[in-house]
Structures are given as C-alpha cells and as structure tokens.
Design a protein with these regions (language model features):
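Structural beta-alpha unit
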Residues: 74-109
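Small/aliphatic-rich secondary-structure junction motif
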Residues: 3-52, 78-80
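Glycine-rich, Arg-bearing micro-motifs that act as flexible, cationic patches
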Residues: 108-130
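Short glycine/serine/threonine/alanine-rich loop segments
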Residues: 31-32, 82, 106, 137
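Conserved beta-strand positions in the Rossmann-like core of class I SAM-dependent methyltransferases
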Residues: 34, 85, 140
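A short acidic, glycine-rich active-site loop
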Residues: 53-68
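Short, hinge-like loop/turn segments at secondary-structure boundaries
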Residues: 50-54, 103-105, 127-128
Length: 143
C-alpha cells in the first residue's frame, strides 16, 4: 500500500477536499503526507509585467500564501496523528508536482480536480491533466 502521499494544494476548495481525503487515507493506512504548494512562475511574471509589481514582493506574497496553505495541511495532519512534511516551490505547477513526487519518493499523488483561478476553472484542471499524463505513480483526483 502507499507509504508516502504527496498532496498538491493551490488553496482552493477542491484542494481542501483533496487534502481531507489524503489525510484520511494516510491515517487509515499509516502513511505520511508531503504537502506541496507550487508558486506558478507564469503568475509571478504576469503580475510583474501587467501590474508593474516588484518581482520580489510578488514572490514573497505568494510564498507566504503557499506556506499558509501547507501549514494548514500540517495542522490537519497533526490533529489526525499523520506526519506531514511541508514544501513550497516555484515553477510550472504540473512539472513541479511530478518532479517533487519523484524526488520525495511519493507513491501516490492526490489533487483536487481543478483550481479556483481563471482559466483553470474553464478547463478540467489543466494542471491535473498534465500530472495524470506525466506521473509515474498513481494519481487520485478528488472532485
């Protein structure tokens, strides 16, 4: 069975549902959880070019929001008695999820079916589609 479950969060309600499922599964089977938030490099570049924002300021704000999201997962894990490691990374979200899963030797990836932002609401989770295509381990998509 699974020993290391990677749960990817973007802070959306779908991610919260995926997190709940990952924690419950981990508790039931005695697995540990890796909580990952990816700062989308395209979001950073867009904020800098379109809004004239300072790159370091944008990155710091997104880092803080990402850390808050994974810290929430850590708290859920603590309450359930599930060990949780937290990570915030910057890059292309789908590729980063797959890369972190490989680097951390995750044997299951858990994700929400789509994010809450812009075009990802219109597409059935473009990040999820890419992860499903590229991942070398099972992927649980929570609706």
């Amino acid at each position: 069975m699974y020993k290391r479950i990677l749960v990817a969060t973007d802070g959306s309600s779908k991610s919260a549902m995926a997190t709940k499922s990952a924690i419950e599964l981990a508790k039931a089977i005695g697995a540990e959880v890796i909580a990952l938030n990816v700062i989308n490099e395209v979001t950073v570049a867009s904020a800098v070019s379109q809004l004239g924002s300072d790159r370091k300021d944008v990155e710091a704000r997104l880092q803080a929001a990402g850390q808050k999201a994974v810290d929430g997962i850590k708290s859920m894990g603590d309450a359930a008695g599930v060990p949780v490691t937290t990570m915030v990374r910057q890059g292309a979200p789908a590729q980063m999820v797959v890369d972190v899963a490989a680097a951390e030797k995750a044997d299951l990836i858990v994700m929400g079916s789509h994010g809450e932002s812009g075009m990802s609401k219109l597409l059935i989770g473009s990040v999820v589609q890419k992860v499903l295509y590229w991942a070398t381990v099972p992927v649980l998509v929570v609706r």
